[in-house]
Amino acid sequence: MSCNQDTEILMLALFQTIDLALNLYTWVLIASAIFSWLYAFNVINSRNQFVNAIGSFLVNVTEPALRPIRRILPNLGGIDISPIILLLIIFFIRSFMWNTLYPMTV
């Protein structure tokens, strides 16, 4: 194998790893939004230790990325669109990565 092929394989592995992490984080964001709706409408028991552990995990994983977006967005009266904005940002990052950055490395 040439050095160019090694670099190409390494870059592909790097891009696929980043893409997998962003895809996984997308699903965690969706799960967090659904969980918050279920919690808000009292569909799930908030005193259940397992439910509380899942909720804490989802908040701890998503809050660091959502907090800066919430600071920028205006208050919409109880409607939190920060997960939607973050999902759009992730979509654009993935699209930019595969359509612009990856072809430059090949």
UniProtKB/Swiss-Prot annotation:
The UniProt record lists the keyword rRNA processing: no
Domain of life: Bacteria
Keyword Amino-acid biosynthesis in record: no
GO cellular component assignments: plasma membrane
Compartment(s) of residence: Cell membrane
InterPro entries per UniProt: CCB3/YggT
Membrane topology term: Multi-pass membrane protein
Keywords: Cell membrane, Membrane, Transmembrane, Transmembrane helix
TM region positions: 24-44, 73-93
Protein family membership: Belongs to the YggT family.
Name this protein carries in UniProt: Uncharacterized protein Atu2659.1
Organism, scientific name: Agrobacterium fabrum (strain C58 / ATCC 33970) (Agrobacterium tumefaciens (strain C58))
